[in-house]
A protein has these predicted regions:
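Conserved C-terminal helix/tail region of periplasmic/extracytoplasmic solute-binding proteins
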Residues: 171-236
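Extracytoplasmic/periplasmic solute-binding protein
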Residues: 1-25, 68
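Paired acidic/hydrophobic, glycine-rich loop segments that form the ligand-binding mouth/hinge
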Residues: 69-74, 91-93
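Glycine-centered hinge/linker elements that transmit conformational signals in sensory
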Residues: 22-52, 95
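Short, hydrophobic alpha-helical packing/hinge segments within bilobed ligand-binding/sensory domains
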Residues: 59-63, 77-80, 126, 139
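Beta->alpha turn/N-cap motifs
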Residues: 56, 73-78, 110-112
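Extracytoplasmic/periplasmic substrate-recognition and gating elements
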Residues: 45, 83-146, 198
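Short helix-initiation/N-cap motifs at beta->coil->alpha
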Residues: 51-65
Length: 236
């Protein structure tokens, strides 16, 4: 669950195109993520004792049982929480990463989708299923069950537990998850947890330096393509 507060902070404290800018050589994570790293450390002062002992399921269960008043997680966790306590009354708000409310950004993104492969047989049958799934009535059922936000424009009713985020949704004050741009093999979640457990005075510098180093390691092919493109376009 380390990535949940990390993403919530990053969308408000770093530019949404940070990863692209790093690939282009215009910035580094040491510069772009310093404020994020420093503030996620501060969160530990408000956490339960030994928060590292909680897995995602453990944290959802603990919150459902009233063992914590707030849980830094996305709305996607609500079904898991309600499976333990169906009668729980949940509200939510956008993470206050900045001192000024108008500078805050809602963390929102799509990490699940349907697709039809080129070589798929019986495509018409598949399209019929997708058409059904994309009907307003079907989408509303999904929203009600999963406390989700629709990716389709229409007259949908959002779950009441998202009332605290309505203004951000209506105004489009949202940004994608930063970790959607991280290579899975980079294991950023483990890097963040290691950083949070590091009590040394230079923990932030060590973490950010490692982030830059690991990023180059796991994105070297993409970075090379970006560099080649820039050279061809005369940008460098």
């Amino acid at each position: 669950t380390c990535l949940a507060p990390w993403n919530a902070l990053a969308v408000g404290l770093a530019e949404s195109d940070t990863c692209s800018e790093v690939n282009a050589g215009n910035t580094t994570f040491t510069d772009a993520y310093r404020d994020v790293a420093e503030k996620i450390k501060v969160l530990l002062d408000y956490a339960e004792p030994n928060p590292y002992a909680y897995s995602y399921n453990d944290a959802c269960t603990a919150f459902a049982r009233g063992e914590s008043a707030m849980y830094v997680i996305g709305s996607y966790a609500v079904p898991q929480i309600q499976s333990v306590n169906p009668d729980i009354n949940i509200d939510s708000f956008t993470f206050p990463a900045n001192d000024k409310e108008e500078d805050n950004v809602l963390n929102s993104g799509v990490d699940l989708q349907f697709c039809v492969m080129k070589e798929t047989k019986n495509k018409e049958a598949v399209y019929e299923v997708l058409k059904f799934l994309y009907e307003d009535e079907t989408i509303q059922i999904y929203l009600d069950e999963q406390n989700a936000i629709p990716c389709k424009e229409g007259d949908f009713t959002l779950p009441s537990m998202l009332d605290g985020m309505q203004s951000y949704i209506q105004e489009g004050r949202m940004a994608d998850y930063q970790d959607h741009h991280y290579p899975s093999e980079m294991s950023v979640d483990a890097m963040i947890q290691t950083f949070l457990m590091d009590d040394s005075s230079n923990a932030v510098d060590t973490f950010l330096s490692r982030f830059d180093k690991e990023w180059k390691r796991y994105n070297r092919d993409l970075i090379a393509k970006v560099k080649k493109y820039q050279e061809e376009k005369g940008e460098q």
